[in-house]
Amino acid sequence: MDMIIEVVATAVWTMLPAYVPNNVAVLTGGGAPIDGGRTLGGRRILGDGKTWRGTGFGTLAGVAVALGLNTILPILTRVGADLTPFSLEAAVGLAFGAMLGDIVASFFKRRSGRRRGVPFPVIDQLDFVVGGILCAVILAPRWVIATFTPPVVIAVFILTPILHLGTNAGAYVLGFKKEPY
């Protein structure tokens, strides 16, 4: 049981800098869309939901979360937690990669004819995870190899959809989102 708790704690800890950016982007977005309103094949490339401001603030928030977690790590270590600190490269990779993963998914969502806010099952729940991990691999490969053990990766891919759907439902109830998914 202790091993399961350790794996789950590591999975959540490690992914927090990737979990936060898209939520912050929803709260701080608006302004100029990344695609500048351009279309491809008669459809918006990304849509109004992907903005420079949201991407910038989301990335900064994810990096800030990682740095904040590093600040409290000594306290957690004293009570027995065995968690990995974030290098700046890992923090940037996870945060920016989460935003980039969501942007890439939006591109494919538009190509498939889905409008903004229409569900894209599995992709909606995991795009930011894949983007975050891939960018972290590029910027901090040793950190990723040391941190993302196979059990942690499995936990991330199981927990993330549950957390994603739960936070989206909460954001809907609080009026931050127009749909509960």
From Swiss-Prot:
Cofactor: Mg(2+)
Catalytic activity: 2,3-bis-O-(geranylgeranyl)-sn-glycerol 1-phosphate + CTP + H(+) = CDP-2,3-bis-O-(geranylgeranyl)-sn-glycerol + diphosphate
Protein localization: Cell membrane
Entry EC no(s): 2.7.7.67
A GO cellular component entry from the record: plasma membrane
Segments passing through the bilayer: 56-76, 88-108, 120-140, 143-163
InterPro entries: CarS, CarS_archaea
Pathway: Membrane lipid metabolism; glycerophospholipid metabolism
Main location: membrane
GO molecular function: CDP-2,3-bis-(O-geranylgeranyl)-sn-glycerol synthase activity
Keyword Chaperone: no
Keyword Transmembrane set for record: yes
Family to which this protein belongs: Belongs to the CDP-archaeol synthase family.
Protein name: CDP-archaeol synthase
Origin species: Haloquadratum walsbyi (strain DSM 16790 / HBSQ001)
Gene designation per UniProt: carS
